[in-house]
Structure formats: C-alpha cells, structure tokens
C-alpha cells in the first residue's frame, strides 16, 4: 500500500504533481491541511503561532492515520519545517510545549510513515495564489529546513526535477516499481 509524500518548500509544484498522480495511481489525495486551517481564519507561515502549528500537525497526522494508502502534497516533514521556522523566530513561551509534544510524535513516526518520499527542489519562480508568501528568501529557508529534517531523521527520499510531465512520469514509475 503506497503512502506517498511529496515534500518541498512552497511553490515547488507539490499540489500540481499530487493532483496529477493520485487518480492514475488509484490513491486518495490527502487534503491540504494548512489551507483548511487558513480558511478557519488562522494566520500561517511567518504569522503563525505554536497553537496553529500544533493544529496543522494534528490534522495532518490524522489524515495520514485514517488512510492506509495516499498521495499527500504535504507531510509531517513539511509541517515540521514550517513550524520550526515559526518557533525559531518567536520568543519561547509556555505554549511551545504543545509543539514540543508534536515533535516527539513526529520523530517516532517519520521513518515509517511513508513508503515513498519525493522531494521537489526550488526550480520555478513563486506563483502568487493569495495565500503563499512571495518571499524567495523565506522559500529558500523552508527548503533548507526540509532537506535538513529529511537527513536528520534518516528519511529515505528521492529528488524529482524537470517539467511537470517529467515529474509525473518519474514519480509514477517509481511508485509502481
């Protein structure tokens, strides 16, 4: 049962790729949790709080737990990268304990949570969508955190580069292999 996580910074093509491969692979596409949380009125990215990051983490974990197989255009790795940036750039307060508990759960889960992890490096300019930041420096910082987390937690991953069509072909072939 494939559990496919597509990871990378914002505006790297994760959603486009996930939407393109889910149906041909016969796998459910996990909802994009951060956008759901934003629709509830919570602030994301640089303006998020430990409580918001904890909510995103719990929703992502829940979505992954209730599906035996899936394609996700986000993962616990993504959540940890963004939350790490948010919390590293705020003064520590007692609510950080919420996030600390999430990190412990994630560290236990990361290596066994996914059968395939595909990392999308930054290759394209940021596409404005009304929600994502337009800051290439922030995009690069998140990308660096993502790779560091993958390596730190010994998560096996494969990089995908090239056009959307090339990425679709490569991901599909690797999952079906």
Residue ranges and their predicted role:
Residues 1-3:
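Pre-Walker A (Motif I) flank of P-loop NTPase domains
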Residues 6:
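Hydrophobic anchor at the beta1->P-loop junction of P-loop NTPases
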Residues 9:
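P-loop (Walker A) phosphate-binding loop of NTP-binding proteins
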Residues 14:
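Conserved lysine of the Walker
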Residues 19, 23-62:
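Conserved substrate/cofactor phosphate-moiety recognition/catalytic segment
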Residues 51-112:
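Glycine-rich phosphate-binding loop used to anchor ATP phosphates in small-molecule kinases
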Residues 87-165:
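A glycine- and Lys/Arg-enriched "phosphate-lid" helix/loop adjacent to the NTP-binding pocket
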């Amino acid at each position: 049962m494939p559990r496919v996580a597509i990871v990378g910074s914002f505006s790297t093509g994760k959603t486009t790729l996930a939407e393109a491969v889910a149906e041909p692979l016969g796998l459910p596409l996990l909802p994009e949790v951060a956008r759901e949380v934003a629709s509830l009125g919570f602030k994301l990215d640089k303006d998020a709080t430990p409580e918001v990051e904890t909510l995103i983490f719990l929703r992502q974990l829940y979505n992954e737990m209730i599906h035996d197989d899936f394609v996700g255009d986000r993962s616990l790795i993504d959540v940890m990268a963004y939350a790490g940036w948010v919390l590293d750039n705020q003064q520590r307060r007692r609510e950080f304990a919420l996030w600390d508990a999430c990190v412990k759960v994630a560290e236990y889960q990361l290596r066994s949570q996914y059968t395939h992890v595909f990392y999308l490096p930054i290759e394209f300019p940021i596409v404005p969508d009304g929600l994502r930041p337009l800051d290439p420096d922030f995009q690069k910082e998140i990308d660096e955190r993502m790779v560091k987390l993958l390596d730190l937690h010994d998560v096996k991953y494969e990089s995908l580069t090239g056009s959307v069509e090339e990425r679709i072909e490569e991901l599909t072939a690797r999952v079906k292999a």
